[in-house]
Curated annotation (Swiss-Prot):
Residues 501-658 form the SUN domain. Residues 1-25 form the signal peptide. The lineage of its organism: Eukaryota, Amoebozoa, Evosea, Eumycetozoa, Dictyostelia. It is a single-pass membrane protein. The chain crosses the membrane at residues 914-934. Residues 58-115, 198-227, 261-430, 436-455, 691-725, 747-815, 935-957, 1020-1046, 1100-1162, 1217-1278 are annotated as: Disordered. It is found in: Nucleus membrane. This is SUN domain-containing protein 2. The gene is sun2. Residues 261-289, 347-362, 406-415 have a biased composition (Basic and acidic residues).
Length: 1278
């Protein structure tokens, strides 16, 4: 029976599906059982892990402060508490919402699969984190305390909540105990660290994949909440940092303010010094105008840059103009007040004179003046001015001829000395009528009274008041003019002094080393100076420091020249000496000098640029300022001349050390002291007028009654003694008053200014105190007065010039001036000491504050270290617990993974068994169904598929020879067993191909079943034998464009249609109608072998309808390992006139060729197996003539050995069969095919060809038309 393939495939699919369903159901049952077991184990593990986590996290929860601290301000407290309560309520609501969300999430969760084992742990962790988070938010909102500790006030802290973080700066005055502060700091730091660690751990777990549960829509966003916590903490930390930064900034600002204040003070002091210097200069100018020569030794000013000097000069000028304007205004006001006072005094005097006009003095006594008492009174006044103790106090000043009751009071003004002059000038003498004595009263510290005793006779004439007033007015005008002139002179002198100072700065006094006190060369090699570095081209570097002139430093002028010298020690450089004594060399011209105190120096200080002369001698270059350096660098910039070399013979440096400067200052002070002592020894004592000498004067009669006056001494009196008149007394009193004004009253102002100068200079330069004091001593010493009498013994004459009085004044010295100078010195020292004490107090305060700050910082640092040491143990414990918990968790996870692995292995083994069973079942089914596909039926009406009737391997056989080892071709002609039998089989060649009936039957079904061939002799494999039509069948081939009609006597006609394997012929001729099918039958070709490609090159088998001869030569060469014989089977086909094919079988067989055991069929069609087993080259030829020749050549070489000469093979490469076919005619035409004729005779002398060894490639050449061919390659894989 015929079984359809579709049904078989359908049955196989059903079987496979049923087996799969059975196995799948079994696996599900196993998984459900395992899941029930694992759920219990997992629940237990999760519960244990959750308990462990809660235990660990309980220690890490936020620690609440022990006490709730209060704030001082009640209003702020209430607000903060309300805010905290509101925050708590909000947090509770949030917690409730979170719990609801968690419940919803738990309800919405899908059932847990066996593979999502860690999902349970995730859910547990989420629950735990949410609960912990809700607690932590409440704790944070209520109990987080952020401390803002300032360096100045460490006990001040700020307590704020999350709602009042922005108000942290407002509550700086809240105070909490130190212990509580420490506890709170520790708790806050620990809480911050714990929250950060938790967030880090969560992020790490997310990165590792421990928590992989998908977030639902209702699930709380944990990451955002964690970020909120971080933000809160960061805000607190930022506020702390900001407060600390603010504190530091405030401190820095305070320090800067203090520095600025100090700078301002220094500037003020400098300005005051400049003012005082100006005042001194002005007063000196006044003294010069008054012919009182005062020598002032100015201090050496420190060198300053020109710009600063110019600015200071401008400022000074501006200030001077302002001061002058102020002084003028003050003078005008004073003049007005003085005029009013004068008018008032004149009225009083006029009244008194009218009363006393009746009384006149007749007798006059000599006036005795105690200069010592006057000096005492003046010194008292000066002391009062210097000490400035009597502010707004009245000082009684009386003239030598004043009454006790008539005193004038004037206010104290130290800055304006002209007021005193004007007040004294405005005073008029008043006469005591009773006693005829003029008393001069003054207030002393000792309470001594200074009296001027006078014996004046009364006169009847009274002075004219109008004349006096006019004279006074004229005097005042003269004084004003003098003052104006003095001011102009002062301004001119100031300008001159400024110009002189500028010139002194530009012009240096020091020109050579001889001008220096120390002429030592500090750049000599003898004291240890060295040349440290020079330019590379320099030769004999150390020669410039030597003393000999024959040695020199040599350089080329074109190269850059420079050298660095280390001096013996650090000095104040003043003079530099350079010299070049070599002739026929260029001279250095311009050079620069640089200095530094370190070597190698990062930067050099510019000292100056100098130009030398073109002379062979020593040249000195003086620095503008004295600079203190140890290392000097000299760079030569240019030179004189065009010579090749520029030598330098010597280099010397002159200056002074600090010790030398101090010694010089000490020496100067000592010399000044010696001078002072000499001056003291040469001071004469003052003499009283009229004590030792007597003098007489002649009176100048101004009126009708004139008298003579005499000033008798204590010893002798002149006989011609006459009393002076009133006018003479008045003139004498005026002269005395002028002398007092010029010589005694003005110098104290100078003293004051000098004292102030000393004090200010001592603030700036303490080293120059001695110089200043000594200079002031000289100034003070020259201010004392000595009165000498004329040769006549009388008072000084009025005709004496100011120059003579000034010269006399310089010769006088008083013993009290020495004590005054000493007192001034002591005051200056005390003042300096007080300033030094204040400075030291400031330094002590500054350093004490710094030490306190350092102590505070150190204590904080130590406290931090202690806290860290205490917290390290706790952290170690926490880390150990954390590590233990992690170890436990990992061990549990490892166990779970092991269980998973075991389960997977079990599943794998089950799957293996399943697939083995399936494969075995499929094999069994295939074996069972194989016979259905391979078995053939014996019915004659069996339908066969399309065959290849015109295949080149299709050969006709006419005889039944069972012993033919080659290809047996027979036709119905000769032979008793003549019948047209067409059978196909495989011939076993050397045991490589097996002969089987199945192959034969399959091949017959595929190729040879449609021709109605009958064989009347043999029945082979179900072939019907018909004896009726033997030797009487004639084959007529009619070709009709793609169809083959086979006519036989049995009137068997069959139409063969082309199938899908037939090549479509395109270029067909009218003679050719048969199209070539594929070389292989569809049933004979395995599915792995590719089919010949569809191509246009179709082979035309041309058969002549006129019964032309078809010469088919089948040459088969079988080469065996034994090279002794050659087996050639030549089949020569001759077409007779009777349309019969004569096949001569010449078979030369030897021992190597074994006949098959089964009967050999009469025709052979080569199968694919045969083709693949034998490497082959198949050539199809079509010459396009009336007759075509088809030749198949198969060659096989069994071994790689060289063929012997007896082996003949036919070359099949591109040969045409026209005239090449070898026709071997045998006389014997037996059906057995055994003949011993000329079987090995070949025509055309074809040479033997050696074929290559067996390979897997076969070449297919298709020739068509006029030598057109195409080559196809096909690789066989069988």
């Amino acid at each position: 029976m015929i079984i359809n393939k579709k049904y078989i495939l359908f049955i196989l699919l059903l079987l496979f599906i049923t087996s799969c369903t059975i196995v799948f159901s079994q696996q599900q049952q196993q998984q459900t059982e395992q899941s029930e077991q694992t759920e219990q184990a997992i629940n237990n593990d999760v519960n244990n892990s959750i308990n462990d986590i809660f235990e660990n996290d309980s220690s890490k929860q936020l620690r609440q402060p022990q006490q709730q601290h209060t704030i001082v301000d009640d209003g702020n407290n209430n607000n903060n508490n309300n805010n905290n309560n509101n925050n708590n309520n909000n947090n509770n609501n949030n917690n409730n919402n979170n719990n609801n969300n968690n419940n919803n999430n738990n309800n919405n969760n899908n059932p847990i699969d066996n593979k999502d084992i860690l999902g349970l742990k995730k859910l547990a962790l989420l629950k735990q984190f949410e609960e912990q988070k809700s607690k932590s938010e409440n704790d944070i909102n209520n109990d987080i305390v952020i401390l803002n500790l300032e360096n100045d006030n460490p006990n001040q802290i700020i307590e704020t909540t999350t709602t009042t973080l922005n108000n942290s700066n407002d509550n700086k005055n809240n105070i909490i105990d130190d212990n509580q502060d420490e506890k709170l700091n520790e708790n806050i730091k620990e809480d911050k660290n714990e929250i950060k660690n938790e967030i880090k751990n969560e992020n790490q777990e997310k990165d590792k994949g421990i928590i992989d549960v998908e977030k639902d829509e209702n699930q709380p966003n944990i990451e955002e909440k964690g970020k909120e916590k971080q933000n809160l903490l960061e805000k607190g930390i930022e506020n702390e940092n900001q407060n600390e930064n603010q504190i530091q900034i405030e401190k820095e600002k305070e320090i800067e303010i203090e520095i600025e204040k100090e700078k301002e003070k220094e500037n003020k002091e400098l300005i005051e010094e400049s003012k005082t210097e100006k005042d001194n200069q002005q007063k000196e100018n006044k003294e010069n105008t008054n012919e009182i020569n005062v020598t002032v030794v100015e201090e050496p000013e420190q060198p300053q840059p020109q710009q600063q000097n110019q600015q200071e000069q401008q400022e000074q000028q501006q200030q001077e103009h302002k001061e002058e304007q102020q002084q003028q205004e003050q003078q005008q006001q004073e003049q007005q007040t003085q005029q009013e006072q004068q008018t008032h005094q004149q009225q009083q005097e006029h009244q008194e004179t009218q009363k006393n006009s009746s009384e006149e003095t007749k007798t006059q006594s000599p006036i005795q003046v105690n200069t010592t008492d006057v000096n005492n009174e003046i010194e008292l006044k000066n002391e009062g001015d210097n000490n400035s103790q009597l502010n707004d106090s009245s000082i009684p000043i009386t003239s030598p001829l004043t009454n006790d009751n008539d005193t004038l009071k004037t206010t104290k003004e130290d800055s304006n000395n002209n007021n005193k002059n004007e007040v004294i000038n405005n005073q008029t003498p008043l006469i005591d009528e009773k006693n005829h004595q003029h008393n001069y009263e003054g207030n002393n510290r000792n309470g001594d009274d200074v009296s001027i005793i006078s014996n004046i006779p009364k006169t009847n004439k009274a002075p004219e008041t109008q004349q006096q007033q006019q004279q006074q007015q004229q005097q005042q005008q003269q004084q004003q003019q003098q003052q104006q002139q003095q001011q102009q002179q002062q301004q001119q002198q100031q300008q001159q002094q400024q110009q002189q100072q500028q010139q002194q700065q530009q012009q240096h006094v020091v020109l050579t080393p001889n001008d220096l006190p120390d002429k030592f060369n500090y750049a000599s090699s003898e004291c240890g100076a060295n040349v440290l570095q020079t330019n590379k081209e320099a030769w004999e570097v150390s020669s410039i420091l030597a003393s000999s002139r024959d040695r020199y430093l040599l350089n080329e002028c074109n190269k850059s020249q420079w050298f660095v010298v280390e001096l013996c020690e650090e000095i104040g450089v003043q003079i530099i000496e350079l010299a070049n004594f070599e002739f026929f060399s260029s001279m250095f011209k311009d050079f620069i000098v640089l200095g530094s105190n370190r070597y190698p120096a990062q930067s050099w200080h510019y000292l100056g640029q100098f130009t030398a002369e073109n002379s062979r001698k020593q040249q000195y270059f003086v620095l503008k300022e004295k600079a203190w350096y140890k290392y000097l660098k000299v760079k030569i910039l240019s030179h004189y001349g065009d010579q090749l070399y520029c030598p330098i013979s010597s280099f010397k440096v002159y200056g002074s050390t600090m010790v030398d400067d101090l010694k010089n200052q000490v020496d100067i002070n000592i010399s000044e002291l010696e001078k002072f002592q000499r001056d003291l020894s040469s001071i004469p004592y003052p003499m009283e007028i009229g004590s030792d000498t007597s003098y007489s004067t002649t009176t100048s009669t101004t009126s009708s009654s004139s008298t003579s006056s005499s000033y008798p001494s204590s010893k002798t009196k002149s006989s011609n003694s006459e009393y002076p008149s009133w006018e003479r007394i008045q003139s004498f009193s005026e002269k005395l008053r002028k002398n007092v004004e010029q010589q005694l009253i003005q110098p104290p102002s100078v003293l004051n200014t000098n004292d102030n100068n000393n004090n200010n200079n001592n603030n700036n330069n303490n080293n120059n105190n001695n110089n200043n004091n000594n200079n002031n001593n000289n100034n003070n010493e020259e201010q004392f007065i000595y009165y000498e009498t004329n040769g006549n013994g009388g008072p000084p004459s009025t005709s004496t010039s100011t120059s003579s009085s000034s010269s006399q004044n310089h010769q006088a010295r008083t013993p009290q001036s020495v004590f005054k100078t000493l007192a001034d010195k002591i005051k200056a020292i005390e003042f300096n000491q007080s300033i030094g004490n204040k400075f030291m107090e400031k330094l002590e305060r500054y350093y004490s504050e710094e030490i306190k700050n350092l102590k505070f910082d150190v204590s904080e640092f130590l406290n931090d270290i202690i806290k860290l040491g205490n917290s390290l143990d706790e952290k170690l414990k926490d880390h150990r617990k954390y590590d233990d918990n992690k170890f436990k968790e990992t061990s549990k996870e490892i166990k779970i993974l092991k269980e998973k692995i075991e389960k997977l292995e079990e599943q794998k083994s089950a799957d293996r068994n399943f697939y083995l069973v399936v494969t075995l079942v499929s094999l069994l089914i295939g074996l069972l169904l194989k016979p259905l596909f391979t078995s053939s039926s014996s019915s004659s009406n069996k339908s066969y598929p399309n065959s290849m009737p015109n295949s080149p391997t299709y050969l006709n056989s006419g005889s039944n020879n069972y012993n033919n080892n080659g290809i047996i071709n027979s036709s119905g002609g000769s032979g008793g067993g003549g019948g047209n039998l067409q059978n196909s089989s495989f011939i076993g060649i050397n045991g490589q191909l097996n002969f089987s009936d199945d192959n034969i039957s399959a091949f017959l079904n595929s190729s040879c079943s449609n021709f109605g061939l009958n064989n009347n002799n043999n029945n082979n494999n179900g072939i019907n034998n018909n004896n009726n039509n033997s030797n009487s069948n004639s084959n007529n081939n009619s070709i009709n464009n793609g169809s083959i009609n086979i006519n036989s006597n049995n009137s068997l006609q069959q139409r063969i249609h082309h199938n899908k394997y037939i090549h479509q012929r395109r270029n067909s001729s009218p003679l050719v109608g048969v199209q070539l099918e594929s070389f292989f039958s569809p049933n004979a070709i395995p599915p792995t072998i590719p089919i010949v490609p569809q191509d246009d090159n179709n082979i035309n088998y041309n058969y002549n309808n006129n019964n032309n001869t078809n010469n088919i030569n089948n040459n088969y060469n079988y080469n065996n390992n034994n090279n002794n014989n050659n087996n050639n089977n030549n089949n020569n086909n001759n077409n007779n006139n009777n349309n019969s094919d004569n096949y001569n079988n010449n078979n030369n067989s030897n021992n190597n060729v074994n006949s098959p055991s089964s009967p050999t069929p009469s025709s052979i069609i080569l199968s694919p197996k045969f083709i693949t087993s034998i490497p082959k080259n198949i050539n199809y030829y079509n010459n396009g003539g009336s007759g075509s020749h088809l030749k198949n050549r198969f060659s096989r070489q069994a071994s790689e050995s060289v063929l012997s000469q007896n082996h003949y093979q036919i070359n099949h490469q591109n040969h045409s069969l026209n005239g090449v076919t070898t026709n071997i005619n045998n006389n014997n035409s037996n059906s057995n095919g055994n003949s011993n004729g000329n079987s090995n005779n070949m025509t055309n002398g074809l040479p033997p060809v050696s074929m290559p060894s067996s390979s897997s490639h076969d070449n297919l050449l298709l020739h068509r038309g006029n030598n057109q061919s195409k080559k196809y390659k096909r690789r066989s894989h069988l």
